[in-house]
Amino acid sequence: FENIVVTTPQTNATIVAERSGIMSKKVNASIIGVIENMSYMEAKGNKIYPFGKDGGKDLSKKLDVPFIGAIPLLEDITVSSEGSNLFAFKENPEFENIISIANEILKFQPKKKPIDLKIN
């Protein structure tokens, strides 16, 4: 299995995410990398870090895996994802960042065939 560890920048969140990464390694699941969600927000052109800074980067170093990227706290993302249309905010400058993260994930090919789930 391959995993992606997702965290927010807060220390407590990275501690929990680190446990997830350690458990993945114990069961021989590879970790593709770390993504930091709700990394920052922008106000008047300035980045604000309400939950701290670089928690995801620090975690990727601890787990010795790549840091895939940081996703900002952005209302456009929330609104478009709740409406099941992630491309609704493609005019936002952060859209390219999300596409870049997705492309990094797509570079990894599964080491095993995915489990074939049957739904009715």
Language model segments and positions:
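Inter-motif core of Ras-like GTPase G domains
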Residues: 1-12
